[in-house]
Structure formats: structure tokens, C-alpha cells
Amino acid sequence: MLSLSASAADVGAVQRAKALAELMVLDTPDEQSFDDLVFVAAKACGVPIALITLLDTDRQWFKAKYGLDVCETDIEHSVCRIDIDKGDLLEIVDLTADARTKRNPLVTGEKHFRAYAGAPLVLRSGAVVGRLCVIDTAPRPAGLSEMERAMLQALARLASENLELRRIAKASERLTELQTALVEIGEVIRSSSGTEEMTSGTSAIVGRTLATDR
């Protein structure tokens, strides 16, 4: 059970969905800059699993993963979403003993999740889109050390900034594509011998350009 009120959670979910749409990152291929962060997180915290988790409306999708062989799971099974809109580090030292997670299939099933810590991914807009988390297959009664917590939070900030920079780069690429399309349309208009040729040429350019948004 999540601790936020339904209304607050709804607002956070709407803000998150909007931010993820703007990031244009869901279902994209692996990227070394993100893969490196989960590798370092796992090694720094001494755990077998680390993930950069983005919380979509009906699933949690992993932009980067270390030690896990799936790309996403149902949002209902997400530990990362617990108290997500508080924007704080979440740590559960024994997932089998916590009422919020003890019946989670990722805990009771073959994945055998036992301990969890996740730092929020907070964008410049304030939207919290997910967590950088580390997971152990054995309980950790003492939890993370102060240094490990600080490292996890620092890596989460780097992941958040990486998401922002990726968005800016993609927006710049898109602007270049649109500018190129306008130049091509101008050339078609100048070189066309008639309306039919002009319409056909410009339609092809517009169709190709819009297709990249899908």
C-alpha cells in the first residue's frame, strides 16, 4: 500500500507521464552512459542487481540493468513506486518482512529480491520519473552504509542529468530534421513544373518527417 493520498499520487503520475513523454526515452536501446551507472552502483553497494527504473503508467521499464534479464515488469509489482513522489531515498532492508512488499511476486518468486534501496530520479522540472535502485538477494539488516547511500544518491543525480542531456540532444536532432525538411520543401517548390508534382514532392517530405515522431 502506498502512503501518499490517492489525489497526490494521481498528480504525481500525471506529471511523471508528461515528463517521460518529453524525455522520449521509453523503449529505447541500451546506452553505455546509463549502463555504466548501474554497474558502478552495483559494485559500490556490493549487490548483484542495479537498475535505472522509469515508472510508466502501467509498467516499470528499465533504461539500464545490471544482474537482471528482463526489461520491464508490471507497475503493480514495482518497489520503486513506493513513496515515489516524496523524492527521498527508499530503503527496505528485508522485503519479506515489510507489509508493502512481502507478497510482491518479485520477492516471493524466482527473482528472490530480499533487500532494496532506491534513490529518486528528479528532473529539473521537479518531476520524479523513477529511481536508480540496488537490490540484494539476501536481507541486509544493517542497510546501506552512509557512504553507500551517498554514492547511490550521487549516481541517481548523474542519471537524472543524463536523461535531461539526452532529451536536449534529441530535441536538437529533431530541430535539425525539421529545418532540413523546410529546405527540401523549398527546393521542391522552386523546381516543380506543376501543382501535382509540387504536392506529391512536399507530401513525401512531410510524411517522412512526421514518421520520425511515431
Where are the model-predicted features located?
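Signal-transmission linkers at sensory-effector interfaces
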Residues: 1-32, 158, 162-191, 195-197
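Regulatory sensory and allosteric helical modules in signal-transduction proteins
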Residues: 18-19, 49-50, 55, 59-65, ...
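Helix-loop-beta substructure at the N-terminus of cytosolic sensory domains
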Residues: 27-60, 76, 183, 188-214
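Short hydrophobic/aromatic beta-strand element in the GNAT-like acyltransferase core
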Residues: 49, 118, 131
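A short, aliphatic-rich beta-strand micro-motif
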Residues: 114-125
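Glycine-rich acetyl-CoA-binding "A-motif" of GNAT/NAT acetyltransferases
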Residues: 128
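Short beta-strand-to-loop transition segments that serve as allosteric relay/switch motifs
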Residues: 131-142
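Amphipathic alpha-helical "output/dimerization" segments
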Residues: 143-164
